[in-house]
Each structure stands twice: as C-alpha cells, then as structure tokens.
Amino acid sequence: MAHFPGFGQSLLYGYPVYVFGDCVQADWCPISGGLCSARLHRHALLATCPEHQITWDPIDGRVVSSALQYLIPRLPSFPTQRTTRTLKVLTPPTTAATPKIPPSFFHAVKKHTPFRNNCLELTLGEQLPAMSFPDPGLRPQNIYTMWGSSVVCLYLYQLSPPMTWPLIPHVIFCHPEQLGAFLTRVPTKRLEELLYKIFLSTGAIIILPENCFPTTLFQPTRAPAVQAPWHTGLLPCQKEIATPGLIWTFTDGSPMISGPCPKEGQPSLVVQSSTFIFQQFQTKASHPAFLLSHKLIHYSSFHSLHLLFEEYTTIPFSLLFNEKGANVDDDEPRDGSQPPARGQIAESPV
C-alpha cells in the first residue's frame, strides 16, 4: 500500500522517516556524493544508486549491497538522533559553485586563528578564501584543516543535510604528517585508507599538500600546504593510546577537538580555537557538560559528533551528556596541588 506524504515508519528499524508519495524522497549516493537515484525502495526504505550498483540504509549509512562494501565506513546511529525532527530524509538544495560566504566568516577566521607558541599566526585566515569549494549538488558543512598537530573542524555553513552522511564534511584540508602525529601509531597506509573511505562515502573534496604521499586510490585536490608539519601541539602525546579525537563545534562557530582518552571510556576535551576560549581552557581538559553549562557549545552540536575510527563506539553516549561530570570549580586547584603549567593538559573527572 502506498504511503501518504508525511511521516512514516521504517519497516526495518521502527523509527520515523519522512515519506514522499509512494517512496521516501531522494537521497545522496555515498560514492559520488551526488543525487544518483531519484527514488528509494518503498517497503524496506533503502536507497539505491543504479549507476554505482549500491544499496544502503539512508538512516545510518550502512551499505547493504555493494562491490565496495568493505570500503564504506559504518557510522553509529545513536538513539538520541532518532526523533521526528532529525530523521527527515529530504533532498537538500543545490548550491552555487562559489557559495556566498559572509565576509564575517573570513574575518572571524583571521581573528580567531589559534595560538602557536604563544603567537597568533594568520596564515590560515589569509589563505582560506583562495581555496576552492565543492561542486554544485554537494552539501558543504564544515572545513577540516590542520592547526598544530591536531585535526580541526572549521564550521562553515550548513544546509539541510540528508540523514545518510550528516557527520562528515565535503571539503577536507588534510596534512598527512600532522594527521599521523595526532593519530598515534597509525601507519601511513591506514591514513590513506581513511581518506579513501571518506572520499568514497561522501564524495568529499580532499585537499592535500602538493608534495605529500602519492596515492593510487583516488586523485585528491592538490594545494600548497597551509602549515608545515608541527608535531608538538597542545594535545598530549601518549604513545600507549592510539584512539583518535572527537570533533565538536562551539556556539560561535569555533571548532573544538578532543585529545586522547585520559582514562578508559572518558573523552578528554581540548580546545583549539578562538582566543577567548583558548585562554579559558588551554590548561585543562573539560567535560562537555562543563562547556555546555557555560553556553559555549550548542546541545545540538553533540549530534555533529564525528568519528574517525570505530574505537569510540564503545563509549556510552550517555556519558557525553552526564551533567554530573561537569566541575564548575575546575579552575581551583584541589588538595593543595599546583595548577598545570602553561601548555600542559590536565585531566578533568567525568
């Protein structure tokens, strides 16, 4: 029986989806990043792309049938995301080849370029406007770039994203050597595989330095390196920890990235962006609830959680929303201990 336009229910998983006529409205092919199939299967609510011979679940992005199935990353689908408001599978509007980005964005980039060795360096802010943006039909949301030895997410702008890939941007600035410094004990081939997965899954434009490792997997966009490799960043270097960080977004659009876990199952959050926030939190790692209580991050930004690898899927999602983990008096040293030295990261209890 045909569905009426409006909200329906997934026959596979039971949570609500948006239904358009007989079928769910069109979705985005995770290989090309564009609109390849105008219709989805009505009963199973699965998206298909005849051109690439791929079928996937539009809710969590899980590939059901594809010759490239082993290359498509599996993104987690948290229960908190399954609401009638967030599970609309809609076609986002196409954008112009050169999006109209407000000048205030570039001004903020220059103004809030993070500290390096206690100095502000404006190279990122000066070169960013000259970079190219995605082709029409893609959905740019964030820009990844390298600050220090950290992978940082710059909030750009957000359209109405489909639910297939709501967590991954479409313009990625990546310096493999810095990425390797941040993701400890990750071989070069693994980093190349990671970029290839993102490329296949999202159709993202990946911008690499001109002289970085040549790859036979895909042809990334080449651009002059924004920064040379810088291996002594703010993130604590712990050789015994190989898990990556998590990327968040502040309410003012400033990015924040987490460091390695100080304890098992506990993310250690380290700020990498605006001058004010950097000065406030540069000497300690804060729980998300602490930053949330100070109105520094949106609650909805937790839904923009980005997982580079699958190790963090073991962290209970409820832990990230545990208000009891926030310590408002974290500035005060406890038990007579001295506060950490400048540039060091202290672990905050969760």
UniProtKB/Swiss-Prot annotation:
Q: Which UniProt keywords apply?
A: Activator, DNA-binding, G0/G1 host cell cycle checkpoint dysregulation by virus, Host cytoplasm, Host nucleus, Host-virus interaction, Metal-binding, Modulation of host cell cycle by virus, Oncogene, Phosphoprotein, SH3-binding, Transcription, Transcription regulation, Zinc, Zinc-finger
Q: Where is this region: Disordered?
A: 326-350
Q: Which residues carry this modification: Phosphoserine?
A: 300-301
Query: Where does this polypeptide localize?
Result: Host nucleus; Host cytoplasm
Looking up InterPro entries in the UniProt record yields: Tax (IPR004120)
Where are the annotated segments for Interaction with IKBKG? Answer: 106-111
Q: Where is this region: Transactivation?
A: 289-322
Motif PDZ-binding: residue span?
347-350
* Motif annotated as Nuclear export signal, chain positions: 188-202
Q: Which residues form the signal peptide?
A: none
Motif range for SH3-binding?
A: 73-80
Which portions of the sequence form the region Interaction with CREBBP/P300?
81-95
Using the UniProt annotation, give all residue ranges assigned to the region (Homodimerization): 116-145, 213-248
- Keyword Metal-binding carried by entry: yes
Q: Where are the zinc fingers (unnamed)?
A: 23-49
Q: Which GO terms describe its biological process?
A: positive regulation of DNA-templated transcription; symbiont-mediated perturbation of host cell cycle G0/G1 transition checkpoint; symbiont-mediated perturbation of host cell cycle progression
Modification sites for Phosphothreonine: 48, 184, 215
| Superkingdom in the source lineage | Viruses
Instruction: State any single GO MF term.
Output: SH3 domain binding
Give me the ranges of the annotated region Interaction with CREBBP C-terminus. Answer: 312-319
The terms describing its cellular component in GO are:
host cell cytoplasm; host cell nucleus
- Domain comment, in the record's words? The 48 N-terminal residues contain a non-canonical functional nuclear localization signal (NLS). The PDZ-binding domain may mediate binding to PDZ-containing proteins and could be a factor of pathogenicity.
Q: Please give the family membership noted in the entry.
A: Belongs to the deltaretrovirus Tax protein family.
**Name of the protein:** Protein Tax-3
Organism from which the protein derives: Human T-cell leukemia virus 3 (strain 2026ND) (HTLV-3)
Question: Which gene holds the coding sequence for this protein?
Answer: tax
